[in-house]
Amino acid sequence: MKKIYLIMTALFIYAAQAQEALPVSDSLQTQSAGKKPSIVRLTGSIQSDILFPEEDNAIGTGSYKDKVLTNTYVDLALSVADYLTVGGRFEYLDHPLPGFEKDFAGWGVSYFYATGRYRNAELTVGDFYEQFGNGLTLRTYEERSLGIDNSIRGGRLILHPLKGLRLKALGGKQRRYWDHNDSFLWGGDAELNLDQWLRKLEEQDARLLLGLSYTGKHEKEEDIYIASDKKLNLPLNIAAFDVRLQFQKNGYNLMADYAWKINDPSFDNQYSYDRGSVLLLSGSYSRKGMSFLLQAKRSENMAFRSLRSMTGISSFINYLPAFTMQQTYALPALYPYATQPLGEW
C-alpha cells in the first residue's frame, strides 16, 4: 500500500510577569531582598500525524473509507509561579492511523489536571501519570506512537517530610481508551536516600537508595464460568508489593528489585490462582573509553491489569522492562523480542 505521511509538531511558550504596583521605596526593598515577581506561563504543543492512504490493486492493499487518517494531539498548560499548574489535552483520533486498536477512534478532552505545590508538598487532582521504582507494580504513561495511554484519574500527594525521604500516595480509576475502568486503584511509595543519613557513605561519595511500594486494586464481582456449571470465586481486592535497593559509587551502579502480587485470576493467565513475582537485577560499570552492563530478569504470572477480562494493550497497571540483545542500525529485525507477562527467565 502506498502511504504518504505528514507529521506536524508545533510548540509555543508565553510568559508574563505580574507584579503589584508598589511605591518606589517598597519596590527597591523587594528587589534588594531578592524576591522575584510572580510569573504566569502558558505552554503548549500541537502534534498531528497524518496519513493519505492510496489504493494499489496490484499488491492488494484494499481500500479505506476515509481519504485522510490522523492522530492529532493538542496540549496546554498554565503555570502560576511555582505554586499552581493547570493543564489538559485535546485528542482527535476519529479516523486513527492503521495499526491502532479500533476502540481508539474518537475525540475529546481526555486528560486534564490541576497541581498545587507548597513547601515540601505537591497535590495533583485530575489525570496524572506515575511510576513506582522500575514500574514492576505500577507504571502509568503515555506512548502515543504505540497507542498506549493508561493514565489515572483521581488524586496524588507527594511529600518530602525529611531529608532524603520522599513519600507518594495516590488513588483513582485507570483510563481505557475513551472511558475509565470501574475498578479503583490506590497505592503508596517511599524512597529513602540512606547516604544522606549515613556519614560514611557521604564521605565516600556513595549513593544508597532504598525503596518500598504498595499497589492495590478493587474490582467488582463478575460472573465468570470455566464450565457451564463452575463459577469462579474471584478475589475483589488485589495487592502487589515491591522492594528495591540501588547502590552507586564512582563508575559502579548496582540495582536489585523484587516485586510480588497475590493471586489475581485474569484472562491473561487463564484465570489461574497462582501468585506472581518478578526479580530484576542490574550491574554496570563505566569509565572513559570503557563500559559494561549485565542484567537479569525472572518473572512469573505478573500480568497486572485494572480489568481482569481485558485483552490487547490497554489497562495494564504495571510495566515489565524488555531485555534483549542490542541491535545495530543495519540489522534491526534480528532477535525480535516482546515481554512475556506470564513468565520468562
Give each language-model segment a name.
Residues 41-49, 77, 85-91, 124-128, ...:
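Transmembrane beta-strands of outer-membrane beta-barrel proteins
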Residues 54-62, 97-105, 135-142, 178-185, ...:
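Outer-membrane beta-barrel translocator domains and adjoining extracellular loop/strand segments
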Residues 77-173, 287-310:
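Outer membrane beta-barrel
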Residues 38, 66-72, 105-110, 148-153, ...:
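Residues that define the transmembrane beta-barrel architecture of outer-membrane proteins
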Residues 1-33:
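Cleavable N-terminal export/targeting peptides
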Residues 75-77, 112-115, 156-158, 187-193, ...:
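Outer-membrane beta-barrel architecture
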